[in-house]
Structures are given as C-alpha cells and as structure tokens.
C-alpha cells in the first residue's frame, strides 16, 4: 500500500510514455507527496485515487462523533494536491465523468490527479486489521 506513485514515476521515466497509477485513498495518504516530484519533472502521469473514505471502506457504524482508526475523510479533495504543484485535478462521481477526465488528462500530457468518489460502503474490511475498528465484530459465531 502506498507504492503506486513510485512505480508510476519509474515507468514514466523509463519509457517516456503516459502512465496511469491507480490507488486507494489510504495508499495515496502514504505516497501523495510524490505528486510534487511528478509535477516538478512534468511527468505524464495520471493518478486515479479511489476515494471511499477509508482503508477498506468508510465508517458505516460511527459511535457518536468518533471515527474508527481505519476511516478517512470522504470529503477530502485529493486532486487539489496536483493543483498546488501545477498539475490538473478532477473530481468524478460516475463513469461519464471518469472517461472525460481520463481523456482530458491523457490529451494534456500534464500530471493529473483524479479523485474518484465511490460510496463508502464499497470495499471490504480485512480480518488482519479489523480488530482496529471498534464498530466491527469479527467473532464469526456472533455474525450468524
């Protein structure tokens, strides 16, 4: 998690061709500042951030105003980091908007971040870190 942009930079530098890097919002949290490098060197990389508001999915069962440790802000505008460094930014909510953003990003040849909003219910909780989410009960006997 969080290696897509490093691989994207390597692919763009090695081939000189446009690259599409796809990662989730949590992964982007690890390597998002690589957008500065991508913009500084004007690499033709389009980053698609799948934004569902969490490591696996957003907070479906909040307790009062406290979010679980695997929850991120679904309202974050991840594309704005590209704008800050001179790249392009799109926020999309459906297939038509995604296709348009990808077409425009490819045609521009500029570094681009596409913030792809998906429902917070999409994704799957991992049994390996599920115990970090206090709202999740991983006891199979209790989930029947």
Regions found by a protein language model. Name each.
Residues 1-144:
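Thiamine diphosphate
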